[in-house]
Amino acid sequence: STCRVRLVVAPDRPPAPLGFDPLLAAVEFSFKVGCPSEFDCVVPHECTPQELPAPHIDYLARDYASFRRLMLDRMALTLPAWHERNPADQMVALVEVLAYAADQLSYQQDAAATEAYLGTARRRVSLRRHARLLDYPLGEGRNARAWVVLEVQAAADGALLPGPDPPADRPGTLLLTKTRLAAGSITTADIEQIAEERPTAFETMHDLRLYAAHNQIVLYTWGDEQCCLPQGATRATLRNTANRLQQLAAGDCLLFEEVRGAASGRTADADPAHRHVVRLTSVRFTEDPLFADDPDDPTNPLGPRLQIAEITWDVADALPFPLCLDLVEDDDIPGHKQPVSVARGNLVLADHGATIVEQLPAVGDTQRYRPWLSLAPLSRQGRVAGRRGRMQLFDAAAAATSALHAADGQDLPAIRLRQDGPTGPMWLPQPDLLGSSRFARTFVVETEADGRTFLRFGDGRYGRRPAGALLAIYRIGNGTAGNIGADALAHVVGISGVSSVRNPLAASGGREPEPSEQVRLYAPEAFRVQRRAITEADYAAVADQQSQVGRAGATRAKAPPRSPAASRRRRSASRT
């Protein structure tokens, strides 16, 4: 049982003595020993709060109008004497400001849920990140490429046409399409005069030494006035008059072009489809033992022999059509014969886009640095695998045909950054930062659907945090807008002594960014693409994907491998 002890003044006076707390003057206890209780000795005192009626909340209110109506209805209940609805009223203005803020917050909440999934994402940046998690490279488009042939004057013989030099931040030579200015060389000051015409800009992709002797080269026919280079030809002979072609070497590119109609001899009747670019694999200078280098007496056995150059090119550059080499009457000079087709040097590869230099905003210390470029669209350059597997813009040792093509999924934006001035460290773009160390000066280019381009930097773990002033050097020009027609280019900027600039073939390779619906369709299935080779059929399938292979087969080596390395070598040989 529970006993109670209470302090009193006297038995007949129950109040507590003076100086004692009345609540603490009594205590209850029991005489049980060693019997612990599972309950707390504190006596609970619960005071149930008064329940107020819950307000009616319309959870369907998600925009400005509904939030404004909801708050005005609530104020009609809490302030029944207030009936003002004039927009100039202070209370109404406060309600509308809160409705605007609620509308923005609601949008952010909806956007966070929407962008969280590939099937519902609307921003292109979100689609790109979701696709990256599925190992699917989202296509951001690619700029076009074109072969450009230049004719130079004798005063500019041996001049250098510079290409890009990224370490020195030097862009390629600027080429422009036709304008009201005369074709050929123009200055940088002339660009301001034609700015309103918005000419399409290209830039050279490599250095080129210009020679006047390469403007037009006659193909040698060994005395035959009616002959042609057959379809599929990979060799020809050039007339090396006065040894003017001594600068021609393997690796140079030549254009074979029909300049007159084979039947009429008129230049207007030349077939523009009979133009083809090849890259020389060998050049051999020799002479014709039967003919002399004397136009008045070519059969003179005592005169100096006619100098020629025998050239060859890759099978991949084989002529796709028969090239007529007949000699026909010249319309301008009666009795004088001119060749139907000629070869031209001074050929350079160029791609779509003009270089822009822009100072980026200052790097802040409080929030994530994510600047955006003021001009668009950013150029995306295709790349190919070189001889050693390293990715590059084009292979200067491969066939000329391959220079206009690039590998899928290997495009990189044409942009780089300089930190703290033109001589500071360089920042380079990467497809993502997952493989970047915390010291790597790399960044990711993210483009929205409207063409705006943002730059995303590392967080100190995956990629270095940016610091200092950043200078952006990038190119604008992308997509099918660069697929200009043949003979559209007409100007070269900053190079004197050039009388003619043109692209004999239409530019190609420009493609638009991949549509969002296509990303949603293909990205979830990207893992089904086979990228391994284990069985004989796998190796044959990989070999069939090469453009140079017509049909492939693979067999397993009969001899057992002596080591794993030997097994790999045999398998590689079987694949080849």
Task: Locate predicted features.
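Signature of Asx- and small-polar-rich beta-strand/turn repeats characteristic
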Residues: S1-T576
